[in-house]
């Protein structure tokens, strides 16, 4: 009996291996057929920004403001307005910013205002969250919201909302900055940097991305389809971690947005609009002002940066408290 059992085991294993091989082959065949059935597009090497431009303003967005700031910014002349994209559920992140880099409203006599940009809660409205958000707005008055769904692919709608809000309700801002809730901002450094500029018009800066390739990997969140963006490279643009522009550009960019179809990447979209307006990126001489990728920063480095990306709410609070201590830096 023993030899028969030993003979049967390899046969079973061979049969199992054969089944797995056939299964993998079938899956591979399916993927090949699926890929071949997809429409294929030639990547356009030479970029023509007029490809995105429509002569009629057919892309003007008419979403309704459902929450707006308490302060009457139209009667103020803020030096800087910081607009932070946030999800409705990011309660802790907003609070962390309110008690750290967004707390102080005046730096050396220059007014700095911070607001949060939200859409409507995605999927079914969470009534508890909706009530909490209303209470938060009553308490702080710093939430700006429209009635589009708050999703990753709608980030561009938030940016368009931000430009519209500045146009209609805060037109006297000298500078605006768009950033995210996971970004550490050294507000004092930012104000100093802007005060030391030689010019304050037609100004745009941040973490520059030049000749950045469009990514076609379908299962990655940074994927963009050929239909949406047919070119090989993106325009020169600044990362959405934190870009800054002078107030005079806001109405020009907002008007251009009504002629340019939104794409899923809001920072690239702003870059397209600015390229159509022939506005160049001001590249900072100091390469240590903006950090796109999370890196280890000590307290002395934090005192030198303007914006660093990839921090949790807890880390933002901790690093802000550490930065305020009287630590002597020798570099």
UniProtKB/Swiss-Prot annotation:
GO terms for molecular function: galactosylgalactosylglucosylceramide beta-D-acetylgalactosaminyltransferase activity; N-acetyl-beta-D-glucosaminide beta-(1,3)-galactosyltransferase activity. Keywords: Glycoprotein, Glycosyltransferase, Golgi apparatus, Lipid metabolism, Magnesium, Membrane, Signal-anchor, Transferase, Transmembrane, Transmembrane helix. InterPro entries: Glyco_trans_31. It catalyses: a globoside Gb3Cer (d18:1(4E)) + UDP-N-acetyl-alpha-D-galactosamine = a globoside Gb4Cer (d18:1(4E)) + UDP + H(+). It comes from the Eukaryota. The chain crosses the membrane at residues 21-43. It is found in: Golgi apparatus membrane. Glycans are attached at residues 72, 154, 198, 212, 326. Gene3D superfamilies: 3.90.550.50. Residues 1-20 are cytoplasmic. Pathway: Protein modification; protein glycosylation. It holds the Pfam family Galactosyl_T. Changing residue 87 to H: In strain: SWN/Msf. Residues 44-331 are lumenal. Detected in brain, ovary, kidney, uterus and stomach. In ovary, specifically expressed in follicular granulosa cells and shows particularly strong expression at later stages of follicle development. Its EC number is 2.4.1.79. GO terms for biological process: lipid metabolic process; oligosaccharide biosynthetic process; protein glycosylation. One of its GO terms (cellular component) is Golgi membrane. Its cofactor is Mg(2+). Transfers N-acetylgalactosamine onto globotriaosylceramide. Plays a critical role in preimplantation stage embryonic development. Belongs to the glycosyltransferase 31 family. This is UDP-GalNAc:beta-1,3-N-acetylgalactosaminyltransferase 1. It comes from Mus musculus (Mouse). The gene is B3galnt1.
């Amino acid at each position: 009996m023993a030899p028969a059992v030993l003979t049967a085991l390899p046969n079973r294993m061979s049969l199992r291996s054969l089944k797995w091989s056939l299964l993998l082959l079938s899956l591979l065949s399916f993927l090949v057929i699926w890929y071949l059935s997809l429409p294929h597009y030639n990547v356009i090497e030479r970029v023509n920004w007029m490809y995105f431009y429509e002569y009629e303003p057919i892309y003007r967005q008419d979403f309704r403001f459902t929450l707006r700031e308490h302060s009457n910014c139209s009667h103020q002349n803020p030096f800087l307005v910081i607009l932070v994209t946030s999800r409705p559920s990011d309660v802790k992140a907003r609070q962390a910013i309110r008690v750290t880099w967004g707390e102080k409203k005046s730096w050396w006599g220059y007014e700095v205002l911070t607001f949060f940009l939200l859409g409507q809660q995605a999927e079914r409205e969470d009534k508890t969250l909706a009530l909490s958000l209303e209470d938060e707005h009553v308490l702080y008055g710093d939430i700006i919201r429209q009635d589009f769904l708050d999703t990753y692919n709608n980030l561009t709608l938030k940016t368009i909302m931000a430009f519209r809000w500045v146009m209609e309700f805060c037109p006297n801002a000298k500078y605006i900055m768009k950033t995210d809730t996971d970004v550490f901002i050294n507000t004092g450094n930012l104000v100093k940097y802007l005060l030391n500029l030689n010019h304050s018009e037609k100004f745009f800066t941040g973490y520059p991305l030049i000749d950045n390739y469009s990514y076609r990997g379908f299962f990655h969140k940074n994927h963009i389809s050929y239909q949406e963006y047919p070119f090989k490279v993106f325009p020169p643009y600044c990362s959405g971690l934190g870009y800054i522009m002078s107030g005079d550009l806001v109405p020009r960019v907002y008007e251009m947005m009504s002629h340019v179809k939104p794409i899923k990447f809001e920072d690239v979209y702003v870059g397209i609009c600015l390229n159509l307006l022939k506005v160049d990126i001001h590249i900072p001489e100091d390469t240590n002002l903006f950090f796109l990728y999370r890196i280890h920063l000590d307290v002395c480095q934090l005192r030198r940066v303007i914006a660093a990306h990839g921090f949790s709410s807890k880390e933002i609070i901790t690093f802000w408290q550490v930065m305020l201590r009287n630590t002597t830096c020798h570099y």
